[in-house]
A protein has these predicted regions:
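Low-complexity, Ser/Thr/Pro/Gly-enriched N-terminal "stalk/linker" regions
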Residues: 21-102, 127-169
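Solvent-exposed loop and edge beta-strand segments that line ligand/cofactor-binding
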Residues: 23, 86-103, 119, 156-158, ...
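C-terminal beta-rich recognition modules with glycine/proline-rich loops and embedded aromatic residues
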Residues: 23, 73, 262, 321, ...
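Well-ordered alpha-helical scaffold segments within catalytic/enzyme domains
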Residues: 49-53, 57, 107-120, 193-208, ...
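Catalytic-core region of carbohydrate-active enzymes that cleave or remodel glycosidic bonds
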Residues: 310-331, 371-423
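Solvent-exposed beta-strand/loop surfaces of large extracellular or lumenal domains
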Residues: 539-564, 583-589
């Protein structure tokens, strides 16, 4: 036992320093104010189990079906727009202006798969797409297919070095509003930000610079634009993926101009006249302490500002970010990790009557504790944005509580956006579906192969195909296990050397994790390093063994357990987390879910679908006893192995509510067998009602 030192680590105790790693999803290896860094692309491979299954589905079925969609102009003009802009064929732009960025997200997903599989067919596919991007890009670095196509159709030579960057679209609100940055709803900076990230990931995965060079040109264009454009144009940007993109370009190139731009973007946001809460620019960012407005835009902004903090260490930014994070997690986030309660609303709402200050918001955060179920928007992109924000907060603080939110969102409100077979998609992720809802919501209740707003499918593709990169983080002499799953890790620690691990687990179905050292520092080094195991928020009890010897300790949720020793090949760590079924209740201020419960086991939130109620009873008539016993049961849905929960609930007397608003409380004394399935798996067995929150029937005493 002398060689084993066990610590309870409150993540704020992680040391800083430069890391050997470079080339992860976010390369904070040289970021002065980061506490940990990603492993390299390709360092982690799923081998089996839950994430092995999901990676296989997404990297094969989803990737290909999405390309088939992009490549079919009768369904989507996504790729055809690039062909027209590249001069391969003639035509007009068709589709949303943000489709360019959506294709870049798809491209980033393909590159992330290639980093693992090295499939030459994927390499060819990427080269084919990149060829069109490069041909479409203007000589000055600008690329946005609606504008490029407009210019080409007006006979403008977009490849001329003498071409001015503002030939079309220099006047906001003018007749030429289709031009560069003339209309904030053109999403140019959003598109360019995703081009930057796609170019970086492609280079890190393949070693090629074709798309990266295009991204450098685009970033240089953006720098020049912000240095020379009118204030009106410079402030005209929404959905700021470019904050993350510009900082990552700085990390990839070392160009200080890019870091300066990233800092200026925050300053410019505070100078907007007639700004909106929907776009998070009504007041300067440094005065914002609560999450507001469009949930995708806000979460992207918070992730990007965290990137800026990692490079600058500005205390005020961290004050804003930690306050906003607390507002989200303790007052505005769904139990599934989803964000964005409102389809449409006003801001502020319910706090004052000042007509001049009331604004419209959409796809937005609501008021504190405003968490409706049937009308929850919860766009998949917003939930991914929540992951991006929390992942960066993990890297800059080392605090395990951020990894917990990454896991919660990924398992529940991100995976729910795609069918189990990887072919159909949701745009929104409500927590309740009722056949009796007396109005029609904007988005369908069933997943479809193509959504007119096709931003979420490629975003989910890249996120799931990159999930292995969330499994571990590193410091110069430590490896942190953040996302459990059967995998292999091969990496190098700056102060220790090459490290290899094999992780075996049935997580999230079971809480047992086994880690075996497959490569350790050479005997001549005899240098100790630490292995940190994340203690999830839901974990109240865990046991730890090293080479079969029990290690005594008490571990608090949302921390790490540390094992520090001189490791050798063959060393084995067994980490077992108790995974009981839990009933959760909400803060009573959350009126829509008061006196209701949600079932959770491990990281998974469970739901009830109408076909899983014995006797075909209505879902609204099922109550969950406070003392219900739910038994795990292995089942299969759409070929995907799942652990369901079986138990006996109570049934309310079934009386029609037609033309009735209120009535006397009925009896709830009839037992009824129910089966709960993980929320991410709902909607895969045909049309059905569904609910996450269910009325609580308290035990009689």
């Amino acid at each position: 036992m002398k060689s084993i030192r066990l610590l309870l680590l409150l993540a704020s105790g992680v040391t800083t320093g430069a890391f050997a790693q470079s080339g992860g999803l976010t390369d904070m290896s040289q970021s002065r104010f980061a506490k940990m860094a990603n492993t390299e692309l390709g360092a982690v491979h799923w081998t089996d189990g839950f994430w092995g299954d999901r990676f296989n589905v997404y990297s094969h079925t989803s990737l290909q079906s999405m390309w088939d969609t992009w490549n079919n102009p009768d369904v989507s003009h996504g790729f055809r727009n690039f062909e027209i802009a590249a001069g391969v064929c003639e035509g007009e732009h068709w589709g949303p202006p943000f489709h360019d960025g959506d294709m870049y997200k798809w491209m980033e997903g393909v590159a992330s798969v290639y980093a693992v599989t090295k499939d030459p067919e994927l390499d060819k596919l990427m080269d084919h797409f990149i060829e069109h991007v490069v041909k479409a890009q203007r000589a000055d670095g600008y690329i946005h297919t609606p504008v490029i196509i407009e210019e080409k159709n007006k006979g403008i030579d977009t490849h001329s070095d003498k071409q001015q960057q503002t030939v079309i679209g220099t006047k906001v609100g003018g007749e030429d509003e289709k031009g560069a940055f003339a209309n904030r709803l053109n999403f140019e900076t959003y598109n360019l930000g995703h081009l930057m990230m796609a170019g970086i990931i492609h280079r890190r995965a393949t070693g090629k610079t074709t798309l990266f060079d295009a991204a450098v040109k685009a970033t240089d264009f953006l720098c020049h634009f912000y240095e020379t454009a009118s204030a009106e144009l410079a402030r005209n940007a929404i959905c700021p993926s470019h904050y993350m993109g510009v900082v990552e370009m700085y990390r990839a190139t070392g160009n200080p101009r890019y870091l300066e731009l990233s800092k200026n973007l925050i300053d410019i946001r505070g100078m907007v006249e007639n700004g909106t809460d929907d776009n998070q620019d009504r007041i300067p960012f440094r005065q914002q302490y609560n999450a507001m407005g469009h949930a995708v835009r806000s979460n992207y902004l918070y992730a990007g500002v965290t990137d800026v903090y990692a490079e600058t260490g500005e205390d005020q930014l961290m004050k804003n970010l930690t306050s906003i994070w607390k507002d989200i997690v303790t007052r505005k986030m769904y139990v599934t990790g989803a964000c964005g309660a409102l389809y449409d609303g006003t801001s502020p709402d319910g706090t004052c009557y000042e007509p001049d200050s009331i604004q419209k918001v959409h796809q937005s955060y609501g008021r504190p504790y405003q968490l409706p179920n049937s009308t929850a928007h919860n766009e998949t992109c917003a939930n991914i944005g929540n992951m991006l924000f929390n992942w960066r907060m993990l890297e800059v603080t080392g605090d395990a509580k951020y990894a917990d939110i990454v896991e919660t969102a990924l398992y529940n409100s991100v995976l729910s956006g795609v069918s189990l077979d990887g072919k159909k998609y949701f745009y929104t992720n409500p927590l309740r579906i009722s056949a009796d809802l007396p109005y029609t919501l904007r988005w369908p209740k069933e997943r479809t192969e193509y959504i007119s707003c096709f931003c979420c499918p490629p975003n989910t593709l890249r996120t799931v195909c990159q999930a292995q990169n969330y499994a571990y983080t590193v410091t110069p002499n430590a490896v942190y296990c953040n996302l459990y799953g059967a995998n292999t890790l091969a990496t190098t620690l700056k102060e220790t050397g090459k490290i290899g691990l094999v992780q075996e687990t049935e997580y999230p179905w079971e809480g047992a994790v086994k880690l075996t050292v497959t490569e350790a520092p050479k005997p001549s080094k005899k240098k100790a390093f630490s292995l940190f195991l994340r203690v999830p928020d839901w974990c109240e009890k865990a046991t730890l063994k090293v080479n079969g010897e029990p290690v005594q300790g008490t571990w608090k949720a949302n921390t790490y357990a540390e094992v520090n020793r001189i490791w050798k090949k063959g060393d084995c760590v067994e980490w077992v987390m108790d995974m009981p079924v839990k009933l959760l209740e909400a803060n009573p201020l959350a009126e829509e879910i008061r006196n209701q419960v949600v079932v959770k086991r491990g990281p998974l939130v469970y739901c009830l679908e109408s076909m899983d109620i014995e006797g075909g009873h209505k879902i609204d008539n099922v109550l969950i006893p406070a003392d219900i016993r739910l038994t795990p049961k292995k089942i299969t849905i759409e070929g995907s192995p799942i652990v369901a929960l079986d138990g006996t609930a109570r049934l309310v007397d079934e009386v029609s509510w037609k033309d009735t608003l209120y009535r006397e409380v009925g009896k709830a004394d009839k037992p009824v067998h129910i089966r709960l399935i993980p929320y991410y798996a709902w909607g895969n067995r045909g049309k059905a009602e569904m609910t996450v929150w269910m009325p609580l029937a308290r035990a009689n005493h």
